[in-house]
From Swiss-Prot:
Family membership: Belongs to the influenza viruses PB2 family.
Motif (Nuclear localization signal): 736-739
Keywords carried by this UniProt record: Cap snatching, Eukaryotic host gene expression shutoff by virus, Eukaryotic host transcription shutoff by virus, Host gene expression shutoff by virus, Host mitochondrion, Host nucleus, Host-virus interaction, Inhibition of host innate immune response by virus, Inhibition of host MAVS by virus, Inhibition of host RLR pathway by virus, Inhibition of host RNA polymerase II by virus, mRNA capping, mRNA processing, Viral immunoevasion, Viral transcription, Virion
Lineage summary: Viruses, Riboviria, Orthornavirae, Negarnaviricota, Polyploviricotina
Keyword field contains Repeat: no
Biological process per Gene Ontology, one example term: symbiont-mediated suppression of host mRNA transcription via inhibition of RNA polymerase II activity
Annotated source species: Influenza A virus (strain A/Kitakyushu/159/1993 H3N2)
GO cellular component: host cell mitochondrion; host cell nucleus; virion component
Protein name as catalogued: Polymerase basic protein 2
Superkingdom, natural source: Viruses
Molecular-function annotations in GO: RNA binding; RNA-directed RNA polymerase activity
Length: 759
């Protein structure tokens, strides 16, 4: 108050006022501060001061021909004095108003195209719904978020090339448009912006918004997709939040969401196959998301999620250096440790071999619904400050931190045996064993942890073993805070390696990610995901496996047929038959396989028993490792529709039905494609007779006597010719080969020759 009185007193003296208003600022340092560099030092003052002038704007001389000197009210719009230091005219803000009302109207067709991102935003806001405002403490954490809805995912360099090509096509400079998305966008934009009068620089700026992902590190409580971030200032303050439902989705958010779902499905599936890494790569390369190849999206999309990062690592791309455990992203902020193998005993006296981290370290832990700061020493939790949306989320974070600390009291809290397995039925590593155990039930863990008296600290409370808050007591070293912990802000990416079991390590050998860390959450993708790989057939259930397996055989029948007769071992090992095995009851799989393989061998050995439909029908069963047994089957069981259904070895069934007249195959009533049997094999099986060591010479030749039946052929000597009756009474001339030539050429040419001979 005293100061203010003193100031008022000073201001009332005219001398003070005079000094302040009339004195020139001639101190060199001040002049330097406000005049050096292009950056405006006090923009709001500059704006106010400029607008107080009569002519704050300068314009090209041509303005004098296009805008009158005075408006209807007689106010001067521009000055006859030219601007000091340039040959431009000084203009009043009133000229802008005049121009807006009376200036020429141009064609507006390009505006929605150039300013697409703005028009789209208006639409989203128009159709969005704003709900009530709630006043409550906001736990915000800084996360790296996408602030630019509706963009493609080009790199800055790729976008630059596209923009140059679209906006300045005649500029000199090498531009290489390689990726599919670059070419498509360039073509589309050139088309849209033909004869566009909007300033090229503006067009370039707006194109950049459409092509490149822009991210900022912002405090967020709630949705992090770009359509929520664009209204962040409307939906959350320091102590309030407003409910909001966006009025429309944007492709970039859909891509991010669908990519995560595809990656999770692929990692889960790869983990249970014989060679997880090879399978994962095969699936990533053969999958499309919203019509774009998944590998292209992975190269461009910066989404950080466990499954996505495993796929990136497999492709040799760099990923973030933080590591994942129990669904939380850990980032070491200080300290260091060395690893040592140690054997520990659980409360059930089971021995576990764990890799102990020796040394003091500090970490930030960031999860979907909780965040924490963890300080730990060798096998000891020093302090955990956790914050989360609700009791459940906070408990999850505490369990993960307790297990991660490797404390003895945690290991001793194990009751019962640890024998958790992953999807491939392999035992989990000890740390994940412990994690799974306590995620199921943490009661003993919390009870045994220990309790301590606490000092009251602003914004922090204690938490008891039953998860109730307390200001007096807390579980040892653990506090709940109102403030969230920021996500790791750096976008630095590191080179990593991946082993065949999909464990991702940094260059010091620390495991950053493994399939155990991939979330089991199921979601529905917003863009269509097309998995072309046979390994993903089972994602839509047993029926899809059945239909896809048979469709694959039919599509590839020509090659399958040759392999069937020449080199069945390779055929039986095809990965396309792998999913089918899960449909065959485990106990009988081996017997079925042995039975079918024997049957096929007889078909190969006995002339005239080749039967396309039967081979296709039974082939998938032969892929399992065979058990030798004398058992004969008239039908084989597959588990679909929740129960065992039968496939008849000879004849049709609801599962596998071949209609001879229409040549259509239906699986469980679903059309599985057209199956062309080889000419009339069903009646005589000539194909196998002819294939095995006979050459078809052409039409019947009477000089070689009456037509023999297929069974009589075996009596011919090498090089001898004879007429043979095939199928529907057609007769062809054949010769028994002089040498046992390759069946391959026989099987390829026989069918064609029979057809030619008959026709």
């Amino acid at each position: 108050m005293e100061r203010i009185k003193e100031l008022r007193n000073l201001m009332s003296q005219s001398r003070t006022r005079e000094i302040l208003t009339k004195t020139t600022v001639d101190h060199m340092a001040i002049i330097k501060k406000y005049t050096s560099g292009r950056q405006e030092k006090n923009p709001s003052l500059r704006m106010k001061w400029m607008m107080a002038m009569k002519y704050p704007i300068t314009a090209d001389k041509r303005i004098t021909e296009m805008v009158p000197e005075r408006n209807e009210q007689g106010q001067t719009l521009w000055s006859k004095m030219s601007d000091a230091g340039s040959d431009r005219v000084m203009v009043s803000p009133l000229a802008v108003t005049w121009w807006n009302r009376n200036g020429p109207v141009t064609n507006t067709v390009h505006y929605p195209k150039v300013y697409k991102t703005y028009f789209d935003k208006v639409e989203r806001l128009k159709h969005g719904t704003f709900g009530p405002v709630h006043f409550r403490n906001q736990v915000k954490i800084r996360r790296r978020v996408d602030i630019n809805p509706g963009h493609a995912d080009l790199s800055a360099k790729e976008a630059q090339d596209v923009i140059m090509e679209v906006v300045f096509p005649n500029e000199v400079g090498a531009r290489i448009l390689t990726s599919e998305s670059q070419l498509t966008i360039t073509k589309e934009k050139k088309e849209e912006l033909r004869d566009c009068k909007i300033s090229p620089l503006m067009v370039a700026y707006m194109l950049e918004r459409e092509l490149v992902r822009k991210t900022r590190f912002l405090p967020v409580a709630g949705g992090t997709s770009s359509i929520y971030i664009e209204v962040l200032h409307l939906t959350q303050g320091t102590c309030w939040e407003q409910m909001y439902t966006p009025g429309g989705e944007v492709r970039n958010d859909d891509v991010d969401q669908s990519l995560i779902i595809a990656a999770r499905n692929i990692v889960r599936r790869a983990a249970v196959s014989a060679d997880p890494l090879a399978s994962l790569l095969e699936m990533c390369h053969s999958t499309q998301i919203g019509g774009t190849r998944m590998v292209d999206i992975l190269r461009q999309n910066p989404t950080e999620e466990q499954a996505v990062d495993i796929c990136k690592a497999a492709m040799g791309l760099r990923i973030s250096s933080s590591f994942s455990f129990g669904g939380f992203t850990f980032k070491r902020t200080s300290g260091s440790s060395v690893k040592r193998e140690e054997e520990v005993l659980t409360g059930n006296l089971q021995t576990l071999k764990i890799r102990v981290h020796e040394g003091y370290e500090e970490f930030t832990m960031v999860g979907k619904r909780a965040t924490a700061i963890l300080r730990k020493a060798t096998r000891r939790l020093v302090q955990l400050i956790v914050s989360g949306r609700d009791e459940q989320s906070i408990a999850e974070a505490i369990i993960v931190a307790m297990v991660f600390s490797q404390e003895d009291c945690m290991i001793k809290a194990v009751r019962g045996d640890l024998n958790f397995v992953n999807r491939a039925n392999q035992r989990l590593n000890p740390m994940h064993q412990l994690l799974r155990h306590f995620q199921k039930d943490a009661k003993v863990l919390f009870q045994n942890w220990g309790i301590e008296h606490i000092d009251s600290v602003m914004g922090m409370v204690g938490v008891l073993p039953d998860m109730t808050p307390s200001t007096e007591m807390s579980m040892r070293g653990i506090r709940v805070s109102k403030m969230g912990v920021d996500e790791y802000s750096s976008t630095e990416r590191v080179v990593v390696s991946i082993d065949r079991f999909l464990r991702v390590r940094d260059q010091r050998g620390n495991v950053l990610l493994s399939p155990e860390e991939v979330s089991e959450t199921q979601g529905t993708e917003r863009l269509t995901i097309t998995y072309s790989s046979s390994m993903m057939w089972e994602i839509n259930g047993p029926e899809s496996v059945l239909v896809n397996t048979y469709q694959w055989v039919i599509r590839n029948w020509e090659t399958v047929k040759i392999q069937w007769s020449q080199n069945p071992a390779i055929l039986y090992n095809k990965m396309e038959f792998e999913p089918f095995q899960s449909l065959v009851p485990k106990a009988i799989r081996g017997q079925y396989s042995g039975f079918v393989r024997t049957l096929f061998q007889q078909m190969r050995d006995v002339l005239g028993t080749f039967d396309t439909t039967q081979i296709i029908k039974l082939l998938p069963f032969a892929a399992a490792p065979p058990k030798q047994s004398r058992m004969q089957f008239s039908s084989l069981t597959v588990n679909v529709r929740g129960s065992g259904m039968r496939i008849l070895v000879r004849g049709n069934s609801p599962v596998f039905n071949y209609n001879k007249t229409t040549k259509r195959l239906t699986i469980l009533g679903k059309d599985a494609g057209t199956l062309i049997e080889d000419p009339d094999e069903s009646t005589s099986g000539v194909e196998s007779a002819v294939l095995r060591g006979f050459l078809i010479l052409g039409k019947e030749d009477r000089r070689y006597g009456p037509a023999l039946s297929i069974n009589e052929l075996s009596n011919l000597a090498k090089g001898e010719k004879a007429n043979v009756l095939i199928g529907q009474g057609d007769v062809v001339l054949v010769m028994k080969r002089k040498r046992d030539s390759s069946i391959l050429t026989d099987s390829q040419t026989a069918t064609k020759r029979i057809r030619m001979a008959i026709n």
